[in-house]
């Protein structure tokens, strides 16, 4: 019995299962001191890393106040593959709760998030346990839109100099602003990008995003796109039953629907690490 208890205790105290560490650093907007949550994988030595940008409802569960399961599970998955994961809170340091509703949306805050991404890159590059030239970026929903604004050749956040290099790769889950109306007409990026979307997503529809990305590919961007049949917004969340969100009705009158798609989620759990590994771990 004592051995069993010790084994269970060791499991929960292992580096792989350790709780996140809260850290702070400046956004490159010049005024905001950001909060972020650092998850480190087991083992010693310098590791590659990933910056995470949450969606428009923030990174915390409305029900529990804890970091939402979708981000905790991705943190664990990325740690399992050897990545340090830094989840950036763009909202609470600016006294914002959500940017999903028409009433709550703040364009200035949204467009400042690429500066948060590059503030996070700078923070990670200064850490002795991170390989500063091997860092990726992942964004969900509005954080996915911020990812597009970050990695474009005319980035809203990129500083003039990057001594240890830029992001090596980026992933955008069902990104906002993924269309020709919200992005520059000549948008392209030197950073390889993976975009994952649900075919039934009413909030950030796949069709206009595909049109936009196809045009960027034609201009030389390296982009992979995966559209999951039958999947809604937030398909990669764990155990999220299908749910309508009337409080976040769009200006066009669309009521968003979120929900887990088991097949899409499982594919993403393998596709994302494979994509990151291809570009972040290359010589």
Predicted segments with their positions:
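N-terminal cap/lid segment of alpha/beta-hydrolase-fold proteins
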Residues: 19-45
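Acidic catalytic loop of the alpha/beta-hydrolase fold
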Residues: 200-204, 233-234
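Short alpha-helix in the alpha/beta-hydrolase fold that links the catalytic acid
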Residues: 205-215
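Short beta-strand/loop motif that positions the catalytic acidic residue
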Residues: 189, 195-197
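C-terminal catalytic histidine-bearing segment of alpha/beta-hydrolase fold enzymes
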Residues: 222-283
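Primarily recognizes the serine-hydrolase "nucleophile elbow" in alpha/beta-hydrolase
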Residues: 109-189
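Serine-hydrolase catalytic machinery in alpha/beta-hydrolase-like enzymes
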Residues: 34-37, 46-126, 239-258
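N-terminal signal peptide c-region/cleavage motif recognized by signal peptidases
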Residues: 14-16
């Amino acid at each position: 019995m004592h051995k069993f208890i010790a084994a269970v205790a060791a499991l929960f105290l292992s580096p792989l299962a350790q709780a996140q560490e809260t850290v702070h650093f400046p956004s490159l907007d010049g005024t905001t001191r950001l909060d972020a949550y650092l998850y480190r994988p087991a083992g010693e030595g310098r590791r590659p890393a990933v910056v995470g940008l949450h969606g428009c409802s923030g990174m915390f569960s409305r029900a529990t106040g804890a970091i939402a399961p979708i981000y905790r599970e991705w943190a664990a998955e990325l740690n399992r593959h050897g990545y340090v994961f830094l989840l950036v809170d763009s909202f609470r340091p600016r006294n914002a709760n959500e940017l999903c509703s028409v009433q709550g949306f703040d364009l200035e805050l949204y467009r400042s998030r690429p500066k948060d991404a590059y503030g996070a890159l700078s923070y990670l590059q200064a850490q002795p346990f991170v390989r500063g030239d091997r860092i990726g970026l992942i964004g969900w929903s509005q954080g996915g839109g911020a990812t597009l604004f970050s990695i474009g050749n005319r980035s809203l956040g990129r500083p003039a100099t990057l001594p240890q290099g830029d992001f090596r790769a980026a992933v955008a889950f069902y990104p906002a602003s993924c269309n020709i109306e919200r992005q520059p007409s000549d948008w392209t990026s030197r950073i390889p990008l993976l975009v994952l979307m649900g075919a039934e997503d009413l909030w950030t529809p796949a069709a206009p995003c595909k049109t936009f990305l196809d045009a960027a590919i034609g201009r030389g961007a390296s982009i992979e796109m995966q559209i999951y049949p039958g999947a809604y917004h937030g398909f990669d969340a764990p155990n999220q039953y299908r749910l309508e969100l009337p409080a976040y009705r769009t200006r066009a009158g669309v009521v968003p629907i979120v929900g887990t798609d088991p097949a899409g989620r499982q594919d993403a759990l393998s596709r994302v690490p494979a994509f990151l590994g291809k570009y972040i771990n290359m010589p």
